[in-house]
Amino acid sequence: MSRLVYFSSVSENTHRFVAKLGLAADRIPLRPTEPFLRAEDEYVLIVPTYGGGNGLGAVPKQVIKFLNDPGNRSLVRGVIAAGNTNFGEAFCIAGDIIAAKCDVPYLYRFELLGTDQDVLRVREGLGRFWLQRSQIPA
């Protein structure tokens, strides 16, 4: 298990962003016929925002199922969200929802595939995040 877990729809936008990060990552299955993913270590979740801007259905059902597993939920340490600025106020709202429900920091948000600058910021930010977490006394 890596320190990144992500979900990507058939559009593959989030998958392409994660691939550009060049970091090990585990993907939450798209289809219910695929094996269920169980987290084995602390991780940051990268998730797209669904919906048309009203916030309803913003968190993909597959992500909800993944986080409803007590073991998976207990290991999430932060969230990064993708979205579409056309959603207005609901831009990347899936990150807000997950951060609030799981009581974890909302680390970053980016649009669609993300820019090269987004990739750099996330890669560097994750490095700092895990370093800081390693310095927290148990």
UniProtKB/Swiss-Prot annotation:
InterPro entries: Flavoprotein-like_sf, RNR_Ib_NrdI_bac, RNR_NrdI. It holds the Pfam family Flavodoxin_NdrI. Signal peptide: none annotated. It comes from the Bacteria. GO terms for biological process: protein modification process. GO terms for molecular function: FMN binding. PANTHER family: PROTEIN NRDI. Probably involved in ribonucleotide reductase function. Belongs to the NrdI family. This is Protein NrdI. It comes from Beutenbergia cavernae (strain ATCC BAA-8 / DSM 12333 / CCUG 43141 / JCM 11478 / NBRC 16432 / NCIMB 13614 / HKI 0122). The gene is nrdI.
